[in-house]
């Protein structure tokens, strides 16, 4: 193959290879999704269409790399893809893993949009985009704790958001009043506020909202107690 005198510039490229025998998580997050969701009038505190769209995109990513992934877990506008510790996907290059997974997810989001939001076209000035990062975890304990962290975070965020928006929508509070009402409250108190002041039993909220979505490497979308399922989820890995 012919070479030019300018090929020397390739020496300035760097390829960060992730440590071997460590679990890899590629986590994607919606960028400026507060503005995006407001423009497309997402329902608060949860928009079922938007969450199912995220799940469909993540499922396609998992199935594309099912031999390299253990699972994916998502809530709101984020998703975490957990890769096997012995994966050699893209030679474990951080830049490749991060960019290819997030670009595949984003292209699916655009392609599947009309299925979940029929009659609402994406505006060229209001398109979805996501950031992405790769993090490595050295052993089974830390990767289990990572998934647990995201699961617990889902519960904390959803309980707060549910109480916050119900105080606004059902009790007539403005955002500042709702925030003040919830300030300093613990989970049990938020549950009580929802039940006594808003007539909402949090236990009856959809499982997808309360528990997030877990996708197995077979493409199954589950809304389960992740903490109770960790042993089976990571069996053999």
From Swiss-Prot:
Q: Which cofactor does it need?
A: Mg(2+)
Specify the superkingdom. Eukaryota
Q: Does the keyword tRNA processing apply?
A: yes
Which reaction equations make up its catalytic activity?
A: a 5'-end ribonucleotide-tRNA(His) + GTP + ATP + H2O = a 5'-end phospho-guanosine-ribonucleotide-tRNA(His) + AMP + 2 diphosphate + H(+)
Q: Please list the residues that bind Mg(2+) 2.
A: 29, 77
Q: List positions binding Mg(2+) 1.
A: 29-30, 77
**Keywords recorded for this protein, A-Z:** GTP-binding, Magnesium, Metal-binding, Nucleotide-binding, Nucleotidyltransferase, Transferase, tRNA processing
What GO biological process terms are annotated to this protein in UniProt? tRNA modification; tRNA processing
- Write one Gene Ontology MF term: identical protein binding
Question: Which family is it part of?
Answer: Belongs to the tRNA(His) guanylyltransferase family.
* The protein's name in its UniProt record: tRNA(His) guanylyltransferase
């Amino acid at each position: 193959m012919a070479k030019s005198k300018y090929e020397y510039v390739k020496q300035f490229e760097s390829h960060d290879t992730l440590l071997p025998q460590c679990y890899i998580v590629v986590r994607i997050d919606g960028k400026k999704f507060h503005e995006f969701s407001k423009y497309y009038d997402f329902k608060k505190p949860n928009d079922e269409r938007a969450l199912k769209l995220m799940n469909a995109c993540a499922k396609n990513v998992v199935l594309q790399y099912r031999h390299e992934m253990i699972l994916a877990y998502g809530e709101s506008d984020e998703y975490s893809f957990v890769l096997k510790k012995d994966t050699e996907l893209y030679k474990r290059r951080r830049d490749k893993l991060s960019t290819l997974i997030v670009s595949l997810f984003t292209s699916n989001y655009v392609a599947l949009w009309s299925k979940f939001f029929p009659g609402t076209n994406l505006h060229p000035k209001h398109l979805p985009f996501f950031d992405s990062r790769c993090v490595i975890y050295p052993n089974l304990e830390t990767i289990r704790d990572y998934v647990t962290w995201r699961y617990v975070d889902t519960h904390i965020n959803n309980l707060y958001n549910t109480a916050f928006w119900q105080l606004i929508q059902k009790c007539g509070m403005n955002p500042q009043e709702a925030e003040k009402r919830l300030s300093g409250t613990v989970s049990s108190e938020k549950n009580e506020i929802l039940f006594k002041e808003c007539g909402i039993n949090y236990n009856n909220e959809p499982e997808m909202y309360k528990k997030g979505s877990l996708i197995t490497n077979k493409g199954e979308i589950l809304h389960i107690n992740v903490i109770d399922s960790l042993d089976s989820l990571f069996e053999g890995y």
